[in-house]
Amino acid sequence: MDLPAPIHDFLLVFLGLGLIVGGLGVVLLTNPIYSAFSLGLVLVCISLFHIPANSHFVAAAQLLIYVGAINVLIVFAVMFMNGSEYYNDFHLWTVGDGVTSLVCTSIFVSLITTISDTSWYGIIWTTRSNQIIEQDLINKGQQLGIHLSTDFFLPFELISIILLVALIGAIAMARQ
């Protein structure tokens, strides 16, 4: 996707803020369900980073695999656990929390300085799918990826939503 530079920068900043907010939600929220949903936000933002880089199939695959499978599995596992054990013995701040905050803050600052010093416009990300087809360099796996991300995208997404609804219904019936 060839976006103008200001829109590209805004999109990257917006997705980066989504990553930061979601990561803070995973770490700071005491309810494990809310933490799992924050993890879902992080995984969605990570997969959306591939769209400006013309890697639409990678974005869709990561969205389906990580958000559609891994995060749903985490939510179901948390739903089956006893929720009362998370609220006992809640300490406001410990030494381990301080050390972890210091390490994470230093890693965050080093990443921010590295990202701001990198020239992102000189990087060649990927080729477009129509150029790959024209070069006749594709194998069966690449053809499948191209068709799933173009021709069969809507049916593929609808099947995944139907499977998700069936899983949620099965879990709800099993809990009763």
From Swiss-Prot:
Enzyme Commission (EC) number: 7.1.1.-
Broadest EC class assigned to this enzyme: translocase
Subcellular location: Plastid, Chloroplast thylakoid membrane
Transmembrane segments: 10-30, 33-53, 61-81, 92-112, 152-172
Pfam family, one: Oxidored_q3
Reaction(s) the record says it catalyses: a plastoquinone + NADH + (n+1) H(+)(in) = a plastoquinol + NAD(+) + n H(+)(out); a plastoquinone + NADPH + (n+1) H(+)(in) = a plastoquinol + NADP(+) + n H(+)(out)
Keywords from the named record: Chloroplast, Membrane, NAD, NADP, Plastid, Plastoquinone, Quinone, Thylakoid, Translocase, Transmembrane, Transmembrane helix, Transport
Coarse class of the protein's main subcellular location: plastid
Keyword Hydrolase tagged: no
GO MF annotation, one: NADH dehydrogenase (ubiquinone) activity
One GO location term (cellular component): chloroplast thylakoid membrane
UniProt similarity note: Belongs to the complex I subunit 6 family.
Oligomeric and partner information: NDH is composed of at least 16 different subunits, 5 of which are encoded in the nucleus.
Protein's UniProt name: NAD(P)H-quinone oxidoreductase subunit 6, chloroplastic
Organism: Nandina domestica (Heavenly bamboo)
